A protein has these predicted regions:
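Cys-dependent protein tyrosine phosphatase-like superfamily
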Residues: 7-165, 177-256
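Short, Lys/Arg-rich N-terminal segment immediately upstream of the first membrane anchor
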Residues: 1-6
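Ser/Thr-glycine-rich phosphate-binding loops at phosphate-binding pockets of nucleotides
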Residues: 170, 174-175
Length: 256
């Protein structure tokens, strides 16, 4: 009897394992076929079960603030586990930005729609972006120029009416810093950058499940460090040379 049970269990295991392999092969083929197949594309099998750390940025901040301040369905953030899977896992964006692009690996994160793949945009960068939440790192020209290229292009896409999504690996620090800058800038332009708004920015950051306690306060401190010496708008004007007109136009997209 025991032998029969063991044989039956082994059969079930082999069957399920075979089905899993077939499914993984299907996902890989579906992901890689089509346009841009000459690129090195990142497929994250963990996307089958892993938390995407996905959220609409404005909706998340509104929830944290306790009041609907920002227009939603403009921009979202996540981890990189979605790569190789349906764009539906990250809200079906029009444009995708990959903050974690590595010029050494040249691996492109992407999602697929029914008829095409949406490839994460990156720029002619020489480094992998890291530690953006530490303001002293913005003195590094390569970090500054690359980060500003992302911010400038994100603003352009939002102004054009496109739904934007950006991600890093965990969707935590790099994504958190870009989120903090965007919300900090927009709220400052509307005289809403108060203690409650800074708390909301930090609250959005802490929604990431992989965040460890020692990182608590990083987004709050980042915004406060900028505000010690200048406005966030002046910080972006100085570091990124983004025009005041573009800042005004993107502000109107978030708050009518």
């Amino acid at each position: 009897m025991l032998t029969k049970v063991m044989k039956y269990s082994l059969f079930i295991f082999i069957l399920l394992f075979s089905l899993l392999l077939i499914f993984m092969f299907y996902v890989k083929m579906k992901s890689l076929l089509g346009d841009n197949s000459d690129l090195s594309l990142a497929i994250r099998w963990e996307g089958f079960y892993h938390d995407m750390n996905y959220r609409d940025l404005s909706k998340s901040i509104n929830e944290c603030y306790g009041e609907k301040i920002f227009n939603e369905n403009l921009i979202s953030r996540s981890a990189g586990w979605f790569s190789g899977w349906s764009c539906g896992k990250i809200g079906n964006p029009d444009v995708l930005f990959s903050l974690n692009f590595s010029p050494k690996e040249e691996e492109h994160f992407f999602c697929h729609n029914p008829n095409e793949k949406l490839i994460g945009r990156s720029f002619e960068q020489k480094i992998v972006l890291n530690d953006l939440e530490f303001i002293e790192n913005w003195n590094n020209s390569e970090i500054r120029e690359t980060t500003c290229a992302y911010i400038d292009n994100i603003f352009s896409e939002i102004i054009s009416g496109n739904k934007v999504h950006f991600h890093c690996d965990a969707g935590r620090d790099r994504a958190g810093t870009i989120s903090a800058l965007i919300i900090g800038l927009i709220s400052e332009k509307k005289n809403l950058l108060n203690g409650n708004m800074i708390n909301a920015i930090e609250c959005d950051y802490r929604k990431t499940e992989s965040l460890t306690i020692e990182k608590y306060g990083r987004m709050e401190n980042f915004i406060k460090e900028i505000s010690k010496n200048q406005s966030i708008e002046n910080f972006i004007l100085e570091k990124c040379s983004i025009s005041g007109d573009k800042i005004e136009r993107v502000t109107k997209k978030f708050i009518n």
